[in-house]
Structures are given as structure tokens and as C-alpha cells.
Amino acid sequence: MKNILTIVVILLTGFTQAQTHRFIYELQYKMDSTEIGYEKLNMILDITPKEVKFYGKGLATTDSLNKKFGMNSSYTDMTGQVVKRKINSFDNENYINIKNGYYSFKTTDKINWLIADETKKIENYTLQKATTKFGGRNWTAWFCKEIPFNEGPFKLRGLPGLIFELSDAKKNFIYTLVKSRKLTENYSTADFLESNFGNKAIPINEKQKYKLIMEFYNDPFAFERNNFSKSNNDLKININGKEIHNVDELNTQTKSMQEVIRKYNNPIEIDKAMHYPIY
């Protein structure tokens, strides 16, 4: 195993004493499925007596710095894996950034596992193998009955023990549990999950979500475009470090952005991937 687990030993008698059980997973993932290398970041799984939340550690870090130093920074989680659900539930509230908006939508994501007899040891923990198909991908999980939480990364839950390792068959997404801790208080995510640093999540449905994403793809610089007119030669707009002087240059940037969006179209739920047209 590449990463040494630094799991805090959680005694069964301690499960009801802390308000939040936090598990941190290292996520290795491919934004483009054809790439060889991986992006890496840490994801947080928070389990409270009533709710379960999964989100990027960058959100919590930014929120903590804002509170500590009176800052007003923001952070956009681009993993598409920010979710919240009630304990012991497959009904998820999903959170997503689209352009400058922040939205939430509901899904029911039942997971049917096939538990194998195969086991392995990681440090002092015995892990058991389980497989499932979810989101258009085939998944293998290794869970630990000694840690009696039926949770895991993202929406992958429902096993008789905490998931320590999780990966899809093509190794596009690889999760490894690296740390855990017990928080004495119910950790508030109100400023970065239920809202995104000042932008409260707007409830939508999945059909509306696809419409918003496609609108962004069709014209990713719609706001900038509204500020342009071909007769206004003095207006200059900076996009990704490049100075744009007219609509023709903006159109070139639009095509470049669309190429990037199509290239990095490898969501964890691949069966819900967007089918972007090429203009």
C-alpha cells in the first residue's frame, strides 16, 4: 500500500461521545481518462448523529482561514463530489458550481453490493472485498467491519463497515483512507457547503442542471460578451491572462474553452456525462 494509514483507533465505546467523526481520503483521479498521470487532493467524510457529508478539504481549509483571519476568500470544488444525506440514507443532496452560480439538486442513489470472501490486512485492520456497479463504473471497495460506519467516499455506502479503499475498474478514481479524527462539536459547513462563501445554493432538478451546464458550454464568456460591441475599440477584457480586444478574439477564446471542457469530461458518474457538441 502506497500511503501509510494514520488512522486514529476508534473504540466502540467512543462512537457516541463525539459530535462529528471525520475521515479523510486521498483521492487520485483523472480529469481526462486518456491521461497517464493523476490529480491528487484530499476529501472529507463527516459523519454526525444525523447527517453524512462528503466534500473537498479545500472547502474546509478556506472556510477555516476566513474565520481565523477575517478573510473573504472563496473556493470552488471542481470534483463534482459535494454531497449531503441523512444518516443511513441513499437520498443525496448534491451541490455544484456552474459559472458564477451555486446550486443543489436531489438524487436517490441505491448501491447494491456483492460481498466477497476475500480479505486482506492493512496495518492492524482486516479489510473485506466488495464490488458494485454505480454511475456507469464498476467499483471495488475494501471495508472494515471493525469500524461500524456503513459509509464511504461520495455516494458509495451501505456496507457493514467503513470503506478504507475504493477504486473503479479503469482506475480513474482511487480513494485511500489516510486519517481520521473525532471532533468534539458538530462541525458547521453552513458557509461552504449549504452555501458557497456567500452564495446560497439554489435548488434545481437534474434537467435544469444539464440546461445550465450546456448554456455555459455554448457561451462560457457570456458576461464578457455582453460588455463588448464591435464599435467599441477601447474596451479590453482579460481572460486567463490574455487581453481580449474584440468579439472575434472572444470567439477564439470561447472555442478554446469549449475544447478544454470536452477534454476534461470525465465525471465520477460517467453515465451522466455531458454530450457536448463540436461547433
Regions found by a protein language model. Give the residues of each.
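Bacterial Sec-dependent N-terminal signal peptides
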Residues: M1-F23
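Exposed boundary/loop context
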Residues: I7, L11, S73, D117, ...
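Extracellular or lumenal secretory-pathway regions
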Residues: Q17-K121, T126, T140, K171-Y279
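Glycine- and acidic-residue-rich phosphate-binding/metal-coordinating active-site segment common to enzymes
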Residues: I122, T126-L183
